[in-house]
Amino acid sequence: MRGAEVTDMRPSRGPFTGLLKKILFRQSIKHPRLQPLWGRLHTLSVYGMNYGGGGLIGTSGEAWALVNVVRRVCGNVAAPVVFDVGANVGDYSLLVRRHLPLATVYAFEPARSVYAELAKRVSAGGGRGGPFNLGFSDSQKTVDLYSYTVGGQEVSLISSIDLRLPTQAVEVKTRASERVRVETIDRFCEAEGVARIDFLKLDVEGHELSVLRGARRMLDEGRVSVLQFEFGPANIYSRTYFYDFWSLLAGGYDIFRIIPDGVVPIPFYGEHLEVFLTTNYLAVGKRTP
């Protein structure tokens, strides 16, 4: 990726690094009385790295990434094809149309009540794209889609995710499920004649990995230029890890963590990346100019 503002995550080299390592490996620094300090610094560091800051389009860095990375990658494409998977009521789809006015936007939302609002706001353009009352997974099937209220916000989850949130910070009210049809991205693209996805955006509450597995052919053939996925608390309940995304994508994509005014490259995998706080990631195809 050229020209985007990035921060290198590789450790710096020099005398300060050696001194820091000597200090950190001293047993005295692990003294019980220092633990509250380290806890506060850890919380501050996590916040400063934008972990947990991925919930709102305007402040998460998603808008920045769309304008400064996705638009640049799609700059040589006359009519970019964008998939907004988990479109909800269409806020992100409308943002895409504002910054990529020539894009063909496919907006997918499986929940019928939410889709009704999406359809009012996002219409088809030029006979292609538009809203679809459809979800995606790793196979074609019919599943239960649950709706629940967390802090007043409606969220939908595939039935494989455990809704018993282990937190007392918010009240969780589970509502009746509905049966919905899910498809694979590979099958949908074949049926609809979609040869390439220039930007694939995923926000499906912990089901992102299954959606990507259903797009394996498109990914392996390099027919998805850029993709964005969310990783956070829902992945605890779907039992998926950042390593799963890394294993699936790292061979063909450079992966970045999105921050409010930039993206941070992730050049290698480490256990420290398993942070289950709502965060958005960008994957840019290595074959993408």
What is each residue range found by the language model?
Residues 2-289:
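Phosphate/nucleotide-binding beta-alpha loop and adjacent structural elements of enzyme active sites
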